[in-house]
Amino acid sequence: MDFLSITGGEKLQGSVSVSGAKNAALPLISATLLAKNEACLKNLPDVVDIKTLLSLLEMLGAKVQRIDPHTVKVNSSEILSTKATYDIVRKMRASILVLGPLLSRFGKCEVSLPGGCAIGARPVDLHLKAMEKMGAIVEIKGGYIVANAPKGLKGATIAFDKITVTGTENVVMAAALAKGVTKILNAAQEPEVVQLCEVLQAAGVEIKGIGSNELEIVGQEGEALEFKEVEVIPDRIEAGTYLCAGAMTNSSIRLERVVPEHLSAVTQKLEEIGFGIEYGENHLTLLPASKRRAFEIITTEYPGFPTDMQAQFMALATQCEGASIIEERLFENRFMHVSELQRLGAGIHLRGNTATVNGGTKLLCADVMATDLRASSALVLAALAAEGTTNIHRIYHLDRGYERLEEKLRALGAVIERGRE
C-alpha cells in the first residue's frame, strides 16, 4: 500500500494545470449508456474512480476504447447485461449513476447498493422514490436495487425533499428517454449537473431551466441519443485544493484551466481571509496575505460553500489568526480528519456538526492516516505547513480523486515523495 512522505515548511511557486472534473466525468460516462453512437469523452481525469466506472461499463458489455489517459470512446450499442455487480460498485458510490440510464433505456436493471467514501449516510432512497414515481417497480433484494419498468419510464414531477446531486443526475438521465415530460423541483445546480444537461441537450433532449433549481426534460420515448464529442469541465474541487496549498504556505501560485465562476465561494472566502486573487478568463493567481484572518464557513449546496472543500479549509484554519468556525450541514460523520489533524498539533474542538479551530498553531510532523478522499487532501495540506516530515498512509483515497497529486505539488516546490509499505 502506498504512502506519501511530505517535508513541510517550503514556499510554493509556479503554476499548476487543473484536471477534468471527476464529479462531471462520472455522470457523463454513465450517460453514454443512453447513446446509440460511439461517444467520445475528452479531458477525463486519470484517476481510479474513472477507471472503475469504465470497467463497470465494460462489464455491462460496452466497448471502451482508451485513446490516451484523458480520452475515451464508449460504444453502448450492444449492452449484454444490466446488472452492476457488487465487486465493482462496492468501490465507489457514484456507480449508482448507472441506475437511471440503464432503467430508462433497457427497462430493467440491478445495481448493487453502493460503496465508496465512508462519510456517513447517503441514502439512495431519493433516487429510488423518483424511479418509482416514473413508473418503475423497485425492490431491494440481497444487497441489490432491482428495478423494472417493462413499459418504459414515464414523465413525472419529482420534488426532492433535499437537494441531491447524484439524485438529480440520475433523474435527468432517466427522463431523457422517458415518455412525456419530467419536472424536477429542488434540483441540484452544481456545474457538473449543468454540463450533464448541456450534453444531453446537444444530443437532442429538450431541457429547460438548466442551471436553476427547476428542470423540465422532454423525454425521447425510448429513442437512444446521438452524442456529440464532450470535453469535461475543469475540476473546481481540485482547483480549490491547490489554492489552499498556496494559502497554507502563504505562497503565490497560478492555476491554469479553471472556470473562475465555479470557484466563487472558495475564492471569496480566501479574499475574506486576506489573500489576493487575480482573475483571468480561464486562470487564477493566488497572492500571499499580509495577515491570515480567522473565518466562518457553513457548507451548503452550490453556489454556496462546497462540502468537498470543508476539510481543506479546516487545515487552513490552523494557520489563521484567531478561532475559525466550520459548520457541516450536508453530511454526517464528515469530520473524520479532525483526529488526524490533531495528531499534527491542530487545536480543534468538535460539538455536533460544528468545529472550532484555534488558529496560529505550529504543526509538527507525525504519521497520519487518510480516511476518505477530501480528508486525505486536508492532511496533505497540513503536512505542507508542518515542521519535519509527515507520512500519510492509506492514500488510495487520494488516488480516487486527484490526478498526479504529488507530481503537481512537487512542480510547485513541495518536498513530497510516494513510497510503498
Swiss-Prot record:
One of its GO terms (molecular function) is UDP-N-acetylglucosamine 1-carboxyvinyltransferase activity. Phosphoenolpyruvate binds at K22, N23. GO terms for biological process: cell division; cell wall organization; peptidoglycan biosynthetic process; regulation of cell shape; UDP-N-acetylgalactosamine biosynthetic process. It is found in: Cytoplasm. The modification 2-(S-cysteinyl)pyruvic acid O-phosphothioketal is found at C117. CDD domains: UdpNAET. It catalyses: phosphoenolpyruvate + UDP-N-acetyl-alpha-D-glucosamine = UDP-N-acetyl-3-O-(1-carboxyvinyl)-alpha-D-glucosamine + phosphate. Belongs to the EPSP synthase family. MurA subfamily. PANTHER family: UDP-N-ACETYLGLUCOSAMINE 1-CARBOXYVINYLTRANSFERASE. HAMAP family: MurA. Cell wall formation. Adds enolpyruvyl to UDP-N-acetylglucosamine. This is UDP-N-acetylglucosamine 1-carboxyvinyltransferase. The gene is murA.
